[in-house]
Every structure is written in structure tokens, then in C-alpha cells.
Amino acid sequence: MKGGNADSWQREKLASMESPEEPGASMDENYFVNYTFKDRSHSGRVAQGIMKLCLEEELFADVTISVEGREFQLHRLVLSAQSCFFRSMFTSNLKEAHNRVIVLQDVSESVFQLLVDYIYHGTVKLRAEELQEIYEVSDMYQLTSLFEECSRFLARTVQVGNCLQVMWLADRHSDPELYTAAKHCAKTHLAQLQNTEEFLHLPHRLLTDIISDGVPCSQNPTEAIEAWINFNKEEREAFAESLRTSLKEIGENVHIYLIGKESSRTHSLAVSLHCAEDDSISVSGQNSLCHQITAACKHGGDLYVVGGSIPRRMWKCNNATVDWEWCAPLPRDRLQHTLVSVPGKDAIYSLGGKTLQDTLSNAVIYYRVGDNVWTETTQLEVAVSGAAGANLNGIIYLLGGEENDLDFFTKPSRLIQCFDTETDKCHVKPYVLPFAGRMHAAVHKDLVFIVAEGDSLVCYNPLLDSFTRLCLPEAWSSAPSLWKIASCNGSIYVFRDRYKKGDANTYKLDPATSAVTVTRGIKVLLTNLQFVLA
């Protein structure tokens, strides 16, 4: 091909490449001519590059923050992007917007260093001795995520020695969740607090809030009120009548429902146990329910149980009248499924389980208590049976149980599945439990306590994706058997069935200190227990 013919061929080829795509043209042909490239790691790489230039190479600093004599070479753009406080400072007509050096008075040098670490890296090591100051300063500088994490940390670690101080702190910063946690600790340990400096200087408003929320009678709230008044009788005598009127005393009974099959009969029982002030347990009553229980949970003041001669049938035990009544049955027969109460939606969820043909199920259905109706929703990621279930802020954590292996034989599961009741979506956590198989779980604040066969008791923090194995007395692991767990009145109760009629162990765990005490006077006429629910 020569001369004009060659030039003509080149022009035709270029024209065909530049012309719009003809109808029916192959996508494969156009792919090699023109396509859009999107670098998915671009934004992260840019952010890392900026932080490296700013911190490691100390380039482009345009503001100096002086704290207790130490100067921090920082960047207005980075500070403004993370903190509304600094954004307002640098964009206002105040002198700080134009000054090269800014002096901060309300924060210590060590805590400000932690704030800088958080602003630039998104990571900060929270230490108990500095936690309250970080909490206050992060609120002042409007670092919302850090403030909320400090609040959760304080709520988990609140104890007798700091509960009143934390309560003051939460009140000043309008933090209702932390305030409630601190107030609960204060009212349940009032007898220990009544002669402390923090209690004697407590404002009248906060004292009223504590005693009106229901103080256990064993804490002698009347004596605490008298001690507070007598500390400054001249000024506080006028509050005496209003405080006594506001006082609400409550008993300390913990209701734990044990559902299981009594060895000498063919029916199952529901027994309400009462843990009294001295931690002795007595049985209050029992109601018969035919055949084997398949699942159970407590919703509001009532106990819901699935089972009987027809496995899909559900019963409700009214806690006030101690009467059983039928509810709407499940759409299909299911065994070894998990019932979880979700009070925020006034619903009870049934997750996983087995069919009567012994096939694992990934079905999720929920029961609308007010309407007495079951509704099907999206499925679990992995079919499981016999898993533990715990509701935490509308997210159901389905833990362990049994799943299918590659050959469709069942095996003990270590999976953590999260079902969001707001979006009806399920996902599996990228990490697994420290043990596998059947287990039971209870929620305390934003933690999930998990108990399994043998000596395994673990505290799971879903926010930090962490597990903490708790140390317990030697008696705990003396004979492996299945434990049950319940959360009530700020404590964790763990029940162990020894499979001997009339003989059982119950432990009471203080989540704040991890201290374990053994309850006394236990005589339970049940074996092969299905659930323990508080």
C-alpha cells in the first residue's frame, strides 16, 4: 500500500476510531479505545501523604499552638477539618484567626498531645488517669467521635470510687447515657457513699434525682439523706421534707426464669427464682407446659416460649398473673432456633434453627407483639442452629451454635453474625469467637457476656471488636457442663446445672470489678435446662 492509498486508509481508520459508537457495536472493541479509570485507593493515599508531609517531615505548618510552654507546629486545614472549634476560630474575625501563635489555657500538655495524635492519625490511647480530662476537652474542642468513645469508656468503668464525680461530669456535658450509668452505680452503692466528700457536697438536684430513681432498701437511703442534711443543717434543713417525699425504695429481687424438662416427668416447667438481699435464691412458683421447649425469651414483663406438642406453637406466661396463653404460631415448625427480644420495635425475632427434617435454616422472622402476627424478613448469611442471641441497640448478635461444613455435615460454629433490625440486613464479622459450639449470652450496657460449656466466660466488646476472658473461682471449671447467663440490676448471674436433681451452682459477677460471688441456698428441681432469662 503506497502513496495516496496509504494516506486514505489512515484517514478512514482515524475517522472510524473517533466516530460515535454505532448501535450494536461491541463493548469489547470500545474498551480498548476509551474507558474511565478510578483509583479506589486514591483518597486514602492522598490523606496518608498529607499526614506524612505534615507530621514526619514537618512541612507547611502555618500555626503554632502553645500549651503549658510546649509549642506544637500544626496546620489550620487539618485542625479545621476535624474540629468545628478550630474551624470557627480560624474563620472568624477574632485575633486567633490571624495570629501565628495561639496559647491554649484549658488543657494540659499531655492531653493536648493525645488530641493531636487523634486529629492527625485517628488513633489515641485512652488511659484511665486522663480519661475524664480527655472527655471534657474533646467536648470543648468538638471532637465528637472521641467524646462519644470517652463517654462509653467511662460508662463501662464507672465504679463506687468515681460514680458521683462522673455523674457531675455527665450532667455538665449533657450526656444522658453516661449520667444514667453513673446514677445507677450511685444508687446501688449509696450506703458506701453517704459519708464521702463527694456525696456530702452533692447538689440538691442530683441527690433528688438519685433517690427518686429507686434505691434498694438495703442501701439505707433514709440514713444517706440524713447524713447529707446534717453536713450543712442550717442551709439544708429546708430540703428535708421534699427529699423524704422524693425517696423511692425498691426491693432487690432478681427474677430469673429457668425453663427445662424435669427428669421425673414428661412436661417442662417455668420457674421464677428470686435472688434476695443475701443472695439466697428461693423458688416462687411453677407452671406446666407440655412437651419439649425449642426456644424462649423474655419481652417486657412476660415470658415467651416456643414448643409443645406442635413445635411451631408459641406460649406467653404473663408475669403478673402467672397464667399461660397461646400466641400466633410460627409460620413453620422450627427446632433449636434463637428467640431475641427487641424492645425498640416491640418485636421478638426468631433466627436460624433446624427444620423437622434436621436441615439447618437461615430464616429470620419476627413477631409483632401488639399485632400478634409473624412476618418473614431477609435471611442470615450462614444457616445456624442453637446459637446464642443478644440484642444491642437494635442489632442482634448471633453467636456460635452449629453450621454446615463443606460436606454439609454440622460442625460447631465460631461465627458472629450481626442482624440489623432497622435495615433487615445481615453480615458476618471478619473475626471469630474464641470458642465454638452452643453458648448463651447476655447484654450489660454496651458489652456482651458469653458463656459456653466448660470454663469459658468471655466479655465481648462489639465496638472495639475485642474479647476479654474473665477469671473465675476453681469451682467454676470443676465439672464441664452447660452454663446459662442473665443480666439484671447491674449484675451478671450465671447458672450452672450439674445434672443432679436439686443441686446447682449460681454465680453473681460484678461487671465493673469482675468480682465473683457464689449465691447460697439454691435448690432447683430442674435438669436439662433450656434457658435462663432475667
UniProtKB/Swiss-Prot annotation:
Where would I find the Kelch repeats?
A: 255-301, 302-344, 347-394, 396-446, 448-497
Query: What residue ranges carry the coiled-coil annotation?
Result: none
Task: List, alphabetically, the Pfam families matched.
Answer: BACK (PF07707), BTB (PF00651), Kelch_2 (PF07646)
Under SMART domains, the record lists: BACK, BTB
Q: Where are the transmembrane segments?
A: none
Q: Which residues form the BACK domain?
A: 163-255
Which residues lie within the region annotated Disordered? 1-25
Please give the Gene3D superfamilies that the UniProt record associates with this protein.
1.25.40.420, Kelch-type beta propeller, Potassium Channel Kv1.1, Chain A
Keywords attached to this entry: Kelch repeat, Repeat
Domain called BTB: residue spans = 61-128
Query: Which PANTHER family did the record assign?
Result: KELCH REPEAT AND BTB DOMAIN-CONTAINING PROTEIN 4
Q: Its function?
A: Substrate-specific adapter of a BCR (BTB-CUL3-RBX1) E3 ubiquitin ligase complex which targets CoREST corepressor complex components RCOR1, KDM1A/LSD1 and HDAC2 for proteasomal degradation. RCOR1 is likely to be the primary target while degradation of KDM1A and HDAC2 is likely due to their association with RCOR1. Also targets RCOR3, MIER2 and MIER3 for proteasomal degradation as well as associated proteins ZNF217 and RREB1. Degradation is dependent on the presence of an ELM2 domain in the target proteins.
The miscellaneous remark of the record is: As part of a BCR (BTB-CUL3-RBX1) E3 ubiquitin ligase complex, mediates the effects of the small molecule UM171 in enhancing hematopoietic stem and progenitor cell expansion ex vivo by specifically targeting the CoREST repressor complex for proteasomal degradation.
Complex and partners: Component of the BCR(KBTBD4) E3 ubiquitin ligase complex, at least composed of CUL3, KBTBD4 and RBX1.
Can you say what this protein is called? Kelch repeat and BTB domain-containing protein 4
Gene that this polypeptide is encoded by: KBTBD4
